[in-house]
Design a protein with these regions (language model features):
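EAL-family c-di-GMP phosphodiesterase catalytic domain
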Residues: 1, 6-7, 29-32, 110-114, ...
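Bacterial c-di-GMP phosphodiesterase EAL domain
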Residues: 1-99
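Structural preference for beta-strand elements that scaffold enzyme active sites
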Residues: 22-24, 75-79, 104-108, 132-136, ...
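Acidic-and-aromatic substrate-binding clefts and catalytic sites of carbohydrate-active enzymes
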Residues: 54, 83-89, 113-117, 165-169
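Flexible, charged surface loops at secondary-structure boundaries
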Residues: 66-72, 99-101, 129-130, 151-154, ...
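Distinct, well-ordered alpha-helical segments
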Residues: 86-98, 117-125, 144-157, 204
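Catalytic-core regions built around general acid/base machinery
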Residues: 93-100, 123-131, 177-182
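Short, solvent-exposed linear motifs at loop/edge-of-secondary-structure regions
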Residues: 99-115
């Protein structure tokens, strides 16, 4: 079983202990590589990797459709390709959910996927909104964030990947610009992910974020 879970948690000044909001379900690419093709870099060919993730999407949906684990019936996020959302398999998954559960499911999308076919994304977005899902844009760094108009694109959440270079800013200019972009997108809409240290959380707090994900949070 290559499926993994990682909580997305709220951390506030009033309550510094992480409070789970939902959990991300994902298939570990690294574990898959080690077990199937240990000598091959799955990330070396972007389009091959996307094809692989589409296959893994379908596997994940099948697991969720047939699961008997009540802990993953709701309050989850799953990372899918736009093509998967437009597939019969996603319709089957949608039909398997209770109506009340859909609003607790976050569908995460990658920038390269949505911007490679905006028409398909907008169709998928409108369908997901109609069905009650929340939508997150995953895989953002501090350089990409400035170009994202969250409301116009129709995302409920943005996931910003922490990296130490984000804090390497002696002048404070980068932090000020990043805070401006975060304020524009909405502080409550931001998840600071890949938090592997206390520094990551402190930096997120300097942006006004209260939602975090990563090994340090675990």
């Amino acid at each position: 079983n290559l499926m993994r879970r990682q909580p997305v948690c709220a951390i506030t000044p009033a309550n510094p202990n992480p409070q789970p909001i939902f959990q991300e379900l994902y298939i570990s690419i690294d574990e898959l590589r080690k077990s199937v093709v240990p000598d091959f870099d799955l990330l070396s060919n972007l389009w091959l990797f996307r094809h692989l993730t589409q296959t893994l999407d379908l596997r994940m949906l099948q697991v969720l459709i047939h699961n008997d684990d009540s802990t993953i019936d709701s309050s989850i996020s799953i990372n899918l390709n736009v093509k998967t959302i437009l597939s019969p398999e996603f319709i089957n998954f949608d039909n398997s959910l209770k109506a009340s559960s859909r609003g607790t499911v976050v569908v995460e999308l990658q920038p390269i996927d949505i911007f490679s076919d905006m028409g398909a994304y907008m169709f998928a977005r409108d369908f997901m909104r109609e069905r009650g899902y929340r939508i997150a844009l995953d895989g953002l760094n501090h350089q990409i964030l400035q170009f994202i108009d969250r409301e116009h694109l129709g995302f409920d959440l943005l996931k910003l990947f922490w990296s130490p270079e984000m804090a390497d800013d002696n002048s404070g200019t980068r932090l000020a610009e990043l805070k401006e972009h975060v304020d524009r997108c909405g502080r409550a809409r931001l998840i600071v992910a890949r938090c592997d240290s206390d520094e990551a959380v402190r930096f997120g707090q300097s942006l006004g974020s209260t939602v975090y994900q990563g090994r340090y949070i675990d």
